[in-house]
Regions:
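Contiguous segments within soluble domain cores/interaction surfaces
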Residues: 10-122, 130-135, 139-147
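N-terminal amphipathic/basic-hydrophobic helices that include classical n-h-c signal peptides
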Residues: 1-11
């Protein structure tokens, strides 16, 4: 089941249209099917379990879904950040550049699926952490996960 992210809007700098993060799914692996270009998500999860800390979180993937982008764009810069919400400490940050076809005109009803590979990072204590999604450095969505 896809867990719905908190929906936060930000005005797209190019066209003054609100972009929405409609979902963030965490999983162990993402495979893109060659023939259909569809994604297969392997072993989806919502939290990490540990018997002790500090915990070295092994690598995993995040699939981000962005919608309500209207107009023409060369690229859309999307970032995924993992942080401790109380302190703002960032454990992981990655930026993806979504390149669109030259003739593509987004109507706003399309869902852009952006996979992110998340490399290992260390968590020193149990708690609730956040996956934050940004477009052009403006937050558009987030979801919690427990360690």
């Amino acid at each position: 089941m896809i867990r719905q992210a908190d929906i936060i809007t930000v005005l797209m700098s190019n066209n003054l249209e609100p972009a929405l993060c409609s979902g963030i799914v965490l999983c162990e692996k993402i495979i893109r099917e060659a023939g259909t270009n569809k994604f297969t998500l392997i072993n989806c999860f919502n939290n990490f379990n540990s018997k002790g800390f500090p915990l070295m979180v092994r690598g995993f993937y995040g699939l981000v879904m962005v919608t309500n982008c209207k107009g023409t764009f060369d690229t859309i810069n999307v970032a995924l950040r993992i942080e401790q919400p109380q302190t703002g400490h960032v454990f992981f940050n990655s930026v993806g550049h979504v390149k669109l076809r030259e003739d593509a005109v987004l109507q706003g009803n399309e869902v852009l699926e952006i996979p992110f590979q998340i490399t290992p990072f260390q968590v020193s204590e149990p708690g609730v952490y956040s996956v934050v999604i940004l477009i052009d450095n403006d937050p558009i969505g987030k979801r919690a996960f427990t360690v």
